[in-house]
């Protein structure tokens, strides 16, 4: 058993899903008579479905229940990813190198299980452990998702490399005590003590000791 593990975020980190979410959110808000912009989407980056629904309800021009809005949104995004899910550059290659290095690895996402399962079915990506919004009482930026992933994978958080693309995800992983590698997608993420920031998954390498910046 390896002494270290790798914990991957999903949306924006492994898959280029933010344009897909923007498409689905825009369609839902059009049904509710309200505009939706990229600035609105940035407010929700790395957050939970409940947070998205609350934000969208506040902007809606027509009445709708939270459950109905959530159902519309999840139906739209799930149908979209079943057709095609664009991977981020280097995602499949990094996962393959993590597997070859014998590193246990988990997927840690704020998305619902229905969406996560659709993404995994579409991409064929495989993980030793899966943690989604359905598995926790508090999602990112709370540390619970990463604490649960570390527990399930059997490696202390301090020995887990957490790869994230959003400020909420980085906050979650750092609060859990993980070694954070940030790969910003939509929102910039600055350097901080103990945090590695790279431009792309292509800038990372995996070996038996974990994940590091290529050339570093």
What are the roles of these predicted feature ranges?
Residues 1-42:
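Active-site neighborhood of HAD-like aspartate-dependent phosphohydrolases
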Residues 1-4, 96-99, 103, 112-216:
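Asp-based, Mg2+/Mn2+-dependent phosphohydrolase catalytic module
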Residues 16, 107-109, 182:
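Hydrophobic residues in well-ordered beta-strands that form the structural core
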Residues 22, 26, 49-54, 70, ...:
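An amphipathic alpha-helix signature
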Residues 23, 31-67:
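Alpha-helical substrate-recognition element adjacent to the catalytic core
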Residues 27-32, 93-103:
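A short, Lys/Arg-enriched amphipathic alpha-helix followed by its capping loop at the start of a domain
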Residues 35, 56-93, 101:
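Metal-dependent phosphoesterase signature
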Residues 44, 48, 72, 86-90, ...:
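Short beta->alpha linker loops
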């Amino acid at each position: 058993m390896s002494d270290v593990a790798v914990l991957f975020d999903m949306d924006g980190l492994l898959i280029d899903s933010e344009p897909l979410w923007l498409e689905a959110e825009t369609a839902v808000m059009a049904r509710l008579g309200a505009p939706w912009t990229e600035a609105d989407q940035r407010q929700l980056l790395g957050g939970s479905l409940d947070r998205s629904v609350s934000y969208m309800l506040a902007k809606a021009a027509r009445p709708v229940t939270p459950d109905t809005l959530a159902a519309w949104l999840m139906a739209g995004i799930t149908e979209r990813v079943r057709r095609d899910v664009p991977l981020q550059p280097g995602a499949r290659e990094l996962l393959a190198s993590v597997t070859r290095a014998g590193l246990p690895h988990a997927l840690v996402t704020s998305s619902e299980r229905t969406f996560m399962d659709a993404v995994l079915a579409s991409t064929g990506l495989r993980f030793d452990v899966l943690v989604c919004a359905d598995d926790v009482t508090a999602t990112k930026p709370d540390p619970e998702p990463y604490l649960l992933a570390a527990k399930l994978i059997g490696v202390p958080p301090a020995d887990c490399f957490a790869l994230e693309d959003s400020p909420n995800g980085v906050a979650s992983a750092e609060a859990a005590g993980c070694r954070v590698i940030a790969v910003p997608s939509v929102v910039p993420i600055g350097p901080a003590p103990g945090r590695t920031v790279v431009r792309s998954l292509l800038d990372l390498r995996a070996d038996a000791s974990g994940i590091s910046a290529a050339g570093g």
